[in-house]
């Protein structure tokens, strides 16, 4: 396997909190997949949950070398946890088509958060 891309992002949690206070759930609707949305609505720390998902999706877009444009959308990158709790990525729509075109066979996700920040790194392999 070969590394196709690496992306990292850091999010200030207070910034996400301010956006939610200003515009309600609009950011969450734009960023989260349907499955993530269902979790977010009942999560005990919704701001932190959204900040971490946003960081992973930004990191993934950077790893793919595209950013969020040309038909790609945040909600096409879905973050979920495997049976051991490890964060993973599931792709939908244009993100899935791009991964298939690039020959992506594996995606690695790491996620960390502290009081003020959430950060994520994504590595994609062919």
Swiss-Prot record:
**Main location per UniProt?**
cytoplasm
Q: Where are the transmembrane segments?
A: none
Q: Which GO terms describe its molecular function?
A: holo-[acyl-carrier-protein] synthase activity; magnesium ion binding
Q: Which UniProt keywords apply?
A: Cytoplasm, Fatty acid biosynthesis, Fatty acid metabolism, Lipid biosynthesis, Lipid metabolism, Magnesium, Metal-binding, Transferase
Per the record, the domain of life is: Bacteria
Q: Catalytic activity annotated for this protein?
A: apo-[ACP] + CoA = holo-[ACP] + adenosine 3',5'-bisphosphate + H(+)
The cellular location(s) given in this protein's UniProt record come to:
Cytoplasm
Might you give the EC number(s) for this enzyme?
A: 2.7.8.7
Biological process terms in GO annotation: fatty acid biosynthetic process
**SUPFAM superfamilies associated with the record:** 4'-phosphopantetheinyl transferase (SSF56214)
Which cofactors must be present for this protein to function?
Mg(2+)
For the keyword Iron-sulfur, the answer is no
Q: Could you name the Gene Ontology cellular component terms for this entry?
A: cytoplasm
Annotated residues that bind Mg(2+) are located at 9, 58
Per the record, the similarity remark reads: Belongs to the P-Pant transferase superfamily. AcpS family.
- What is its biological role? Transfers the 4'-phosphopantetheine moiety from coenzyme A to a Ser of acyl-carrier-protein.
The protein's name is Holo-[acyl-carrier-protein] synthase
**Phylogenetic classification of the source organism:** Bacteria, Pseudomonadati, Pseudomonadota, Gammaproteobacteria, Enterobacterales
